[in-house]
Structure formats: C-alpha cells, structure tokens
C-alpha cells in the first residue's frame, strides 16, 4: 500500500541539511531544461517577481553545480497540508510507516519516499516546461507508472494535476479522498479545508498504521468522520460538523 502526497510551494530550510543522492536520469533531464532559463526568463516562466525569479535561478544553478543544500522532503515542504502532518516526535513504528508507505510526487524528483533528500526548487505539472520536446507529464508518465505498478492499493491525496501524470491503469487503483464541512446542513468544500484535512488525515493514517480502505473508513480525526452516504468504493468522503 502506498500513499501519495503532492509537493508544496512554501518551503522551510531552517533545520540541518542532509546528504544528497544522485539525480535519476529523468530528474537530470528536467534540471538541464530548467537550467537553460535566465533569471529574467524565469520571471515570466514562474509568473513571479524579479526578486523571486533571481532566488529560483540561484536554486537551479546550485542544483546544476551539485552545491545545493538538501533536506528531508517532508520537512522541506511547508504548505498548509504539510504543517498539519505529524513530522516530529515520531515513534519507531510511525517512522517505519512513513518510510515504507508515504511517497511524494514531484515534477523534478519523480515519485520518491517522503524522507528523501530534496533541494529547494519550484516546479509543478501546470508549468509549461519542455523536456526533450515533451511536456512534464509525458516525460514522467513511464517512471511514475513504474513506481506503482506492483501496488494493489494506492491512497491518493493528490490534486488532479498530479494524478493525471499516471496512466489510466494506475489511476484505476487509486482511492481518493474528499474533505467537507457541514455548516447547518450545507456541505462546503474549499482549498483551505482540504489542505488542512489532508495533513490531519495523513497523520491519522500514520498514527493508526492504516493499511486498508476499511481501516481508513473507521478513522475519526480533527472532527472529520466518514460519510458512507456520500462516498463511493474508491472515493471516500469525510465530513466535519462546524
């Protein structure tokens, strides 16, 4: 069983770095394509300020020169979902669960264990980077599928931009999750609810060592409970009354 989570734009490097590992050929090809951009070209590519673009340029060049600082991916990313994941004071069993079951899907690194070393970078599958004439999704599809082809159960906490990198055959094995709030009988869903709930849900999976869909249905976390009436066999819905 594998659990897939996305990367995040927000990052935190305020903790000790760890040793890097060599880039996969697919990752090196992406980096080579990114490294062709000047700082001013990155400004329009990323749709960010000149200051941000200059920072990203330095990050890319540091990776290219193999001088970039690397950090465990789970701690490097610091978006809303990540801030709601239990990342410290893990028991040995929780650490093992993380290492064996939780994987990050990255447009630069591929599908990798959640504690893998990553350097600060900015890239997602909505960005129009061409790698040897291919889109990022086309470039990564075979490698993404290869990582999961032997898995029977895949829990996806990904957005559609990441899920659609995988083939239909792999996506058919995915169990997806939706998190909603019940406000006086009105069911609401929005980005902030979803991101926080994904982090809390992953924490519950880790703490309860969940291995099956049945075990996931029984979870009660951060006020969310499973709603069978709203769910499908491979699309579970959790609702929080507020």
UniProtKB/Swiss-Prot annotation:
InterPro entries referenced in this protein's UniProt entry, alphabetically: YaaA
Top-level taxonomic group: Bacteria
Originating species: Streptococcus pneumoniae serotype 4 (strain ATCC BAA-334 / TIGR4)
Family affiliation: Belongs to the UPF0246 family.
Disulfide bonds: none
Cellular-component GO terms for this entry: cytosol
Database matches in Pfam families: H2O2_YaaD
GO aspect biological process, one term: response to hydroperoxide
Protein name: UPF0246 protein SP_1547
HAMAP family linked to this entry: UPF0246
